[in-house]
Structure formats: structure tokens, C-alpha cells
Amino acid sequence: MVVSCGISPRYSDIDAGAMAAAAIDEAVRNAVCVGVDVNKIAGLDNFCWPDPIQSEKTPDGKFKLAQLVRANRELERICRAYRLPCVSGKDSMKNDYGKGADKISIPPTLLFSLFGDHPDVRNTATSDFKNPGDRIYLVGESMDELGASEVSFMLKERGEAKGIGGNVPSLDNPEKLFKSYHSLSSAINSGLVLSLIHI
């Protein structure tokens, strides 16, 4: 049995839909990195949200509700692409404290947990190198997507950037990613991959 999770609350500062997609994808990548059978996975969605109801206390409630709708649309899109059923979940929708200018709200957040079958735990990849001279491969594509990343926040803190970046990672073709994950998991279980880490 493999258990993993994914969470990316900072992405909500730019796009709550991308935040949800990234959380699901991270949970899947974590599981794939140890060799989960991607045909035997299921997920749990846990929404932790600021008050999404328009009111005097929550003047931006419509925007927070729109973020929730966007996150749910991405939840459906990515889970369908990964053939990943959500078997349970939990929603906490009033994660705010205080009033007026002193009000503190959590960022719109989806914690996505995943569990799945591992055919043979003796064929599990770990993140450490095994031998001097091991080859390193980057699987997938790299894009201009550093928005809300650790690098963006570091540059802002150092005064080298005004905002938190531009584009957050987007999953434009999750079906293609899922094929890569399937191949990678098969390679791990065949003993071809000994070390693996998701980034």
C-alpha cells in the first residue's frame, strides 16, 4: 500500500484552480516515485477554505466562492484524466479569524491524499543515489512557471522582485502526464529505476 499527499496553498495567490491541480498532481507524483500501480489508485479531497459566502463580514465572498468553483473544476478535470476516483473528502469552509482589518483568512487550499497498490515492495525506488556515476534524467518538460514558488518568494524578500512571480505550473495536458507516470511506474517495478524524486 502506498499513501501520499499533495498541497500547494501558495498557488492560490495567483490561481486557485492551478493550486488544486498541483495538489492532485503532487500526490500522484509522490506515489509514482515509489512505484505505485497507477491503475489502482484512489484519492481523498480535503478543502480548507476561507468563508466563501458574501456578507458584511466577508465582502470578498463572491471571489472566494469563484475560487472554490475553479478549484472544483480542476479537481474534476485532473482526476478524470488520471482515472483517479475520489472516494472520500472533507470540507472546512469557514477558516477565518477576527473581524474587519484584523480578519485573518487562510489561503484557499486543497489537501489531496492518495492511496494505491504497490505490486511488489521489493521494487521500490528511493530518492538517494545508489552508485557513483549514476545517470540523472529529467522526465517531463520545464516551463516558465515560477509563480508563487520558493524562488519567487525569496526574490521578493531580497527586494529583487515586486510580486510573487507570474505563472504557476499548469497542467495543460494531464493525459500526457498520466502516460508518463504509467511508464515511470512500470520502469520502477521492472527494476530499471532505482532512485527517483519528484520536483
Model-identified regions with their sequence ranges:
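Glycine/proline-enriched, intrinsically flexible loops and inter-domain linkers
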Residues: M1-I197
